[in-house]
Amino acid sequence: MIETGLSGKVVVVTGGAAGIGRATAARFAKEGCRVSVWDRNEPAAVDDLDFQRVDVSNTESVTAAVQAVVARWGTVNVLVNNAGILRDGQLVKVKDGAVVSTMTDETFDAVTDVNLRGVFVCTRAVAPVMITGGGGVILSASSVVGVYGNFGQTNYVAAKAGVIGMTKTWARELGKYGIRVNAVTPGFIATDMVQAMPEKVLQGMRDHTPLGRMGSPEDIANAYVWLASDAASFIHGAIIPVDGGIVVGT
């Protein structure tokens, strides 16, 4: 069994009320971490986790949450930038040779505000705490589509590709302070939201994955825990695929 060295660490998980975020918060708690869940929505059961109602795209909201966590536990050792939303649509939709719709500014901004700006705002707020504390780990959720693009997801792909760029930049900037920065690129993950899709769509996801199945939220949570652990102490600036081989097969 890998010794993670995470017991007693203070971990912030954004978007931690459900899905991958919820599984991630639970997995860090299992390692003996003190976990603060940041989300717009309160989880159904917080157990012994701290909960902060946070809009990750809003500087004041994030600053207040950081102050609350530091007031309670003294520091932040690990930040998991997991919060994300979808608002899919084509850049330009054409029917019978005529343009019938385009992606609106509001649709583009809604996704990039959370999925890209939110990662920036949270990392900017937490990094000084980690520098003062002598180091830490910053992990962010990108996506396989941030690597190869995807039809109907201009906003989402732009944000997830941006997360990859920010991760590599911050690895260069923050490494000297003992802060490791990495990202994961999940593939098709069987969250409750995804599993509610039609079976034909789900089968298409499985068929597109070389392992022949979708991943679970716990698969991503395990990757986050490993990347935050002592076992990954020399992994820095990496973009780790957790996708069942999708990128390899694309």
Describe the residue ranges of each PLM region:
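C-terminal helical subdomain
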Residues: 183, 206-231, 235, 244
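Active-site helix of classical SDR
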Residues: 123, 159, 167
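Short C-terminal tail/terminal secondary-structure segment
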Residues: 1-2, 148, 224, 236-250
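The beta1-alpha1 cofactor-binding region of Rossmann-like NAD(H)/NADP(H)-dependent oxidoreductases
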Residues: 54-65, 105, 218-219
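Short, small/polar-rich loop/turn modules that mediate ligand/substrate recognition or access, typified
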Residues: 175, 180, 235-237
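Substrate-binding pocket helix/loop in short-chain dehydrogenase/reductase
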Residues: 90-109, 194, 205
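Catalytic Tyr-X3-Lys loop
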Residues: 85, 99-120, 135, 139, ...
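Amphipathic alpha-helical dimer-interface segment in Rossmann-like NAD(P)H-dependent oxidoreductases
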Residues: 114-132, 171-172, 176, 229
